[in-house]
């Protein structure tokens, strides 16, 4: 096991995989860049029916403090994510550091631990439970950018193929 701190890229990939493993089957990490109205570039964001979840990766206290000055943090209604979390190694972000409404995830030995604010499965879609009213236009712009790239590469037509279901081999039905 490495004694080196987890990098920002590693945190973003872990966050994306964590979202996918927790019901957000459409998820992106920070290598995906898209235009959004207020310049927000998610470290990880996931979408499921009725909810979106943003995860911000923090590798240092200075990064945490700088993040607070961004326009979509000063005015949370400009930001993406019905639910918002910070992910870090223990000791970088603590519960008392969180802006109102945010939750906390820690990475320990390469695994994501739910520290604070992760809701039960049914709470994700209950409007009254959501801590934020996400900027749905920014989220739509983000998703449009992803779908447009798939279209430019000739893959968008595959959405009409339906869901792939496991079939026994040799069955042509």
In which residue ranges do the predicted regions lie?
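Short solvent-exposed loop/turn micro-motifs enriched in small/polar/acidic residues
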Residues: 37-39, 97
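Anionic group-transfer/hydrolysis microenvironments
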Residues: 32, 45, 58
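Catalytic cores of nucleic-acid endonucleases
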Residues: 52, 58-107
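A short acidic/basic microdomain associated with nuclease active sites
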Residues: 20-37
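Glycine-rich phosphate-binding "P-loop"
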Residues: 1-4, 56-58
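Active-site beta-strand-loop-beta-strand hairpin of nuclease catalytic cores
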Residues: 40-54
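Non-catalytic C-terminal interaction segments of nucleic acid-processing enzymes
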Residues: 2-23, 96-173
């Amino acid at each position: 096991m490495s004694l080196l701190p987890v990098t920002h890229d590693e945190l973003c990939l872990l966050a994306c995989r964590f979202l996918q493993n927790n019901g957000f089957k459409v998820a992106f990490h920070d290598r995906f860049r898209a235009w959004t109205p207020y310049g927000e570039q998610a470290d990880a964001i996931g979408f499921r029916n009725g909810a979106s979840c943003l995860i911000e990766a923090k590798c240092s206290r200075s990064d945490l403090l700088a993040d607070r000055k961004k326009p979509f943090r000063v005015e949370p209604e400009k930001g993406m994510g019905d639910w918002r979390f910070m992910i870090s190694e223990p000791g970088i972000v603590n519960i008392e550091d969180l802006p109102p409404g945010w939750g906390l995830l820690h990475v320990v030995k390469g695994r994501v631990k739910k520290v604070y604010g992760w809701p039960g499965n049914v709470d994700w879609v209950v409007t009254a439970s959501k801590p934020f009213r996400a900027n749905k236009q920014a989220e739509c712009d983000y998703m449009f950018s992803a779908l447009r790239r798939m279209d430019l590469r000739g893959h968008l037509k595959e959405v009409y193929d339906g869901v792939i279901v496991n079939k026994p081999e040799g069955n042509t039905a």
